[in-house]
Amino acid sequence: SLARLVRPFILRRTKDTGLKELPPRTEITLQAELSPAERKRYEDTRLAALAELSGAGEDAQQAGQKRIRTLAWLTRLRQLACHPRLVDASWAKSSAKLDLLMSLIEELREGDHRALVFSQFVKHLSVIRERLDELGVTYQYLDGSTPAKERQRRVDAFQAGEGELFLISLKAGGT
């Protein structure tokens, strides 16, 4: 099978392996209130999804296609909730989540703390990187395009104190 053929080339770490190397996790849940412009964009997209998906009487093939379209719409809504630029490249404003993240990062820096930042969307990490670069925040970065040898070098660099943040895509960092 394809999975058996590619297994030697895929670097995956399980939580059990990684947890031994990490300090205890601190988890804080915060709510980010969308701006009016973000809320409008999200609501417009949600209504467009409902309009497209509200067809009645479908055969099995149409039902399968509808499931695929539903997942695509849900992904688009999740991306909009992260930052509208993930869906609309012309979006020039910030986002509520990015602003909240930047305020948290500032608090971390003031306390001389470091953090791991995970995202399922590499594009979202790219938006975050742009802001961090503007602010002069140092970081390590790892996504699926990072070669295996470079991944370990970046992990080692972060553990040695290089970078205030480590930005990691969930798929590349393991889930």
Question: Positions of the model-derived regions?
Answer:
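Cytochrome P450 catalytic domain signature, combining two hallmark sequence patches
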Residues: 48-55
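Conserved Helicase C-terminal RecA-like lobe
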Residues: 20-46, 58-175
